[in-house]
Curated annotation (Swiss-Prot):
Active site per database record: H92 (proton donor)
Top-level taxon in the UniProt lineage: Bacteria
Protein name stated in the entry: 6,7-dimethyl-8-ribityllumazine synthase
Annotated organism of origin: Paracidovorax citrulli (strain AAC00-1) (Acidovorax citrulli)
Keyword Cell wall biogenesis/degradation: no
Amino acid sequence: MFGADKGTADRLDGRKLHIGIVQARFNEGITEALAAACREELLALGVQEKNIRHVRVPGALEVPLALQALAEQDEYDALIALGCIIRGETYHFELVANESGAGVTRVSLDTQTPIANAILTTENLEQAVARQTEKGRDAARVAVEMANLLEELS
């Protein structure tokens, strides 16, 4: 598997940031690994443990509502959505993937809060396992970078 060229990131100083994480429990083995990698990377970027709020919801469709509730508290510089949707035999995969993704984007735009979307959508469990650690780290980096960018732009 080849990785995407993500370019060189800057604005990765998380020392002053408050970050909220919303994790879906469905496919919990994968989402726990995403969360662990995400938290580890946030700490490595300087975000203080006390400035990380981590909440869990039943599944990917519930993630946007929890993100909105956190964003409306106006305490977080950025939020992170974690989940895992694995294709099954029915149309449900497309519905959950599309609606959760649209919901995350809507919350971000409506609240002007950066949200790193790491809700994995994979064909099978093996693909999810292959992505769980790096996508968790990526989400942390995206959240920190976008929080700092929005601060610069304001």
